[in-house]
């Protein structure tokens, strides 16, 4: 069966399934994720990459659609090359055939274990993309080692949201060495746990990673982190880590150096998840390339979030239950908070979640005022 995604046509098995047993894995539900990846990596190229070569690794390539789209759709004046790898021999053959189908030549294809492939390319790639079925944790260290130590971009997908979102705490502790936070904004804390884990793993190599873009969509979370080198920079990473406890919608935050206390989630990242300039550039690129309304909606929401450094969000449904009132429309609450002098947006991951620099007391006041108006 021949399909098209972005500017790439490709062949997949007639029966599309999404399990680990698939001979050659392709998930059509991840098109939104791949579209956003194109926008984010292109934005990174435009803003931060100053050299004449740009090498990308797609270490778990499956049918190759992600890596082939990078090779064909990313715009760069210098040498752009994508290295696609999959341990499955049939996937390896499929990638080669799909590349021929699209007349794509700026690629190399490998048939190896992902960690073996990455270990053979020490400090080589400008971008390493890990898009597994499940957790990226088994590949994180080799992915970090395969990146250039300054302005390298690490892109990770995790589909094990039961662990990261707190439904399986032991699994999260085992994979990410952290306790998750289960609640209305658990998807944001899934991002923060994953980012915090990656940052900690990098410090042993005297590398400081920081997030520049993240999103939680459908059944997965996706994070993008940029590398920088130096022991002092790596030491400062721990200042951006901590522990969080949710008490009736209020987030209590402890610094990493204070240590773990029972009932808290973490260690996790407690800083801003976004590089505002990169988010704005990615949105411009997505608009120019006429990506789907859904992609634009996600990027627009994240643009608003990037200007607010709040850990978690206020869930209006939870507040309504607590106050025993009917919650007014979200946009009314947002407008009221802005009238009160605060910045406020609806989160991209929770349609009932508000990210704002206001306190919970201010949010409750805004809800009451909107209720009276109605």
From Swiss-Prot:
Keywords: Methyltransferase, RNA-binding, S-adenosyl-L-methionine, Transferase, tRNA processing, tRNA-binding. Disulfide bonds: none annotated. It comes from the Archaea. Residues 1-367 form the Trm1 methyltransferase domain. It holds the Pfam family TRM. One of its GO terms (molecular function) is tRNA binding. InterPro entries: SAM-dependent_MTases_sf, Trm1, TRM1_arc_bac, tRNA_met_Trm1_C. S-adenosyl-L-methionine binds at residues 34, 66, 86, 113-114. It catalyses: guanosine(26) in tRNA + 2 S-adenosyl-L-methionine = N(2)-dimethylguanosine(26) in tRNA + 2 S-adenosyl-L-homocysteine + 2 H(+). Belongs to the class I-like SAM-binding methyltransferase superfamily. Trm1 family. NCBIfam families: TRM1 (TIGR00308). This is tRNA (guanine(26)-N(2))-dimethyltransferase. The gene is trm1.
């Amino acid at each position: 069966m021949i399909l098209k995604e972005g500017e790439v046509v490709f062949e997949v098995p007639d029966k599309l399934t999404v399990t680990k047993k698939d001979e050659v894995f392709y998930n059509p539900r991840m098109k939104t994720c791949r579209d956003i990846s194109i926008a984010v990596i292109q934005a990174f190229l435009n803003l931060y990459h100053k050299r004449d070569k740009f090498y990308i690794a797609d270490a778990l390539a499956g049918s190759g659609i992600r890596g082939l789209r990078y090779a064909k759709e990313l715009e760069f004046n210098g040498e752009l090359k994508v290295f696609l790898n999959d341990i499955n021999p049939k996937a390896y053959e499929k990638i080669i055939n799909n590349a021929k189908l699209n007349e794509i030549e700026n690629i190399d294809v490998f048939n190896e274990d992902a960690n073996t492939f990455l270990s053979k390319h020490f400090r080589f790639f400008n971008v390493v993309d890990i898009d597994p079925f499940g957790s990226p944790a088994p590949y994180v260290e080799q992915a970090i080692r395969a990146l250039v130590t300054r302005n390298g971009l690490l892109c990770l997908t995790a589909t094990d949201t039961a662990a990261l979102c707190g439904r399986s705490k032991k699994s999260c502790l085992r994979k990410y060495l952290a306790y998750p936070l289960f609640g209305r904004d658990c998807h944001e804390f899934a991002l923060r746990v994953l980012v915090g884990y990656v940052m900690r793993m990098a410090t042993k190599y005297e590398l400081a990673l920081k997030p520049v873009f993240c999103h939680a969509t459908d059944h997965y979370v996706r994070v993008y982190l940029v590398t920088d080198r130096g022991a002092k920079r790596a030491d400062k990473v721990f200042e951006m880590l901590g522990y969080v406890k949710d008490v009736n919608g209020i987030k209590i935050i402890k610094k990493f150096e204070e240590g773990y206390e029972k009932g808290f989630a973490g260690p996790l990242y407690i800083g801003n998840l976004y590089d505002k300039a990169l988010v704005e550039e990615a949105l411009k690129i997505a608009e120019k390339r006429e990506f789907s309304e859904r992609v634009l909606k996600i990027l627009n929401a994240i643009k608003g979030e990037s200007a607010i450094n709040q850990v978690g969000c206020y869930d209006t449904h939870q507040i309504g239950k607590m106050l025993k009132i009917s919650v007014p429309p979200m946009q009314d609450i947002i407008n009221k908070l802005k009238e009160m002098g605060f910045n406020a947006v609806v989160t991209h991951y929770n349609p009932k979640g508000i990210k704002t620099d206001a306190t919970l007391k201010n949010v409750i006041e805004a809800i009451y005022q909107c209720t009276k108006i109605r």
